[in-house]
A protein has these predicted regions:
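N-terminal ordered "arm"
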Residues: 26-69
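Outer membrane beta-barrel transmembrane domains
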Residues: 41, 82-83, 206-317
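Transmembrane beta-strand segments that form the barrel wall of outer-membrane beta-barrel proteins
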Residues: 31-41, 178-188, 262, 288-294
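Membrane-embedded beta-strand positions of outer-membrane beta-barrel proteins
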Residues: 31-33, 72-74, 104, 118-122, ...
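Membrane-embedded beta-strand positions in outer-membrane beta-barrel channels/transporters
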Residues: 52-54, 101-103, 159-163, 196-200, ...
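Bacterial Sec-dependent N-terminal signal peptides
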Residues: 1-28, 314-316
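Outer-membrane pore/translocation modules
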Residues: 76-103, 107-217, 222-225, 247-265, ...
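Outer-envelope beta-barrel architecture signal
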Residues: 25-31, 66-70, 114-118, 174-184, ...
Length: 317
């Protein structure tokens, strides 16, 4: 009888332990920081899209028959000419601009094997975004001199933007070594109006199957309300993209007033190539990528420019 009680209690503890270990995989929330900077790819260049900082919180919905993820984000983006110190307007080949915004996003995954993400963004473009202060702070950290030329920046304008992203995997099942997913993004508003389409290629560096697109760090979808068989992830990804732009207020200025000291016309067709490495294990997501993009205006001499992106995220139960 004692042996029976021992084995009974041992079995219960074992079952409970297994249950708890699987329950720990149901991470429902995530906080993260994304940092863009051209210094992540070169210690020499400091120009054009020179810095972006994004802080976010996202969580998985309760009591939903389909997977839904909500996100709140605060972001700041900074743009400068080729030379951060421009004493004369003739030296400005791309307007100085700063954009500060808050954004809400809603992502859901359909049983019909596609995902849809919608977003609403409110912000301010211009001196009120405090980009000059932010750049001087970054320069102080890196030991660079303070910048001049922000008196030529895009004037203040209110930002309201809506976004829609459609995700579609090429396959319904997980592939072991490589898979492909297409995304199409529409941005419509006073700051950016453009349409982009791309293809993500994931190349697995583990021997296990890739997580599905609806449960992967690449698509910001690895949050769940119930325990899953989610595995750690380590993969290389490549994303070629083509787009068509109708409006870019960081270059053209406001849609409603023409008081910016320097503005340029934009190139309608835009191209981009991103490649990098992503790693996700238990509570942590880490990634590094390089983004090469075509010039947004013909005033810029260089046809291709580059910046790097670093992401750090932490999951909560």
């Amino acid at each position: 009888l004692k042996k029976l009680k021992y084995y009974t209690f041992s079995s219960l503890f074992l079952i409970l332990g297994v249950h708890l270990s699987f329950s720990q995989k149901a991470f429902t929330k995530e906080v993260g920081l994304i940092s863009d900077n051209d210094l992540y790819t070169s210690s020499y260049y400091d120009r054009y899209y020179t810095n972006g900082t994004f802080l976010y919180f996202r969580y998985a919905s309760k009591n939903s028959s389909v997977k839904k993820i909500h996100e709140f984000q605060i972001g700041h983006m900074m743009y400068t000419p080729q030379f951060a110190n421009s004493f004369f307007p003739e030296a400005v080949d791309r307007p100085y601009a700063g954009y500060l915004f808050a954004k809400y996003s809603h992502l859901f995954f359909s049983p019909k094997n596609y995902g849809l993400k919608s977003s609403l963004e409110l912000g301010v473009l211009g001196p009120d975004a405090r980009a000059e202060d932010m750049q001087n702070l970054i320069h102080q950290i890196y030991g660079f001199n303070p910048t001049t030329g922000w008196n030529y920046q895009i004037s203040n304008t209110f930002g309201i933007n809506m976004g829609l992203v459609f995700l579609k995997p090429f396959s319904k099942t997980s592939k072991k070594r490589m898979d492909f997913t297409s995304t199409t993004t529409l941005k419509l508003g006073t700051i950016f109006t453009e349409l982009n389409t791309n293809i993500y290629a994931r190349i697995n560096l583990f021997s296990t199957l890739l997580n599905t697109y609806s449960n992967s760090t690449l698509f910001e979808s690895n949050l769940n309300r119930i325990a899953t068989s989610q595995k750690k992830e380590l993969f290389i990804f490549i994303k070629p993209q083509i787009g068509y732009a109708l409006h870019n207020a960081t270059i053209q200025g406001s849609l409603f007033k023409y008081d910016s000291p320097i503005t340029f016309g934009i190139n309608s067709f835009i191209y981009e190539l991103e490649f990098g490495l992503k790693y996700a294990i238990k509570r942590f997501d880490l990634s590094y990528s390089v983004i090469k993009y075509s010039r947004k205006t013909d005033a810029i001499e260089e046809k291709i420019n580059t910046y790097g992106q670093i992401k750090i995220a932490y999951k909560l139960n």
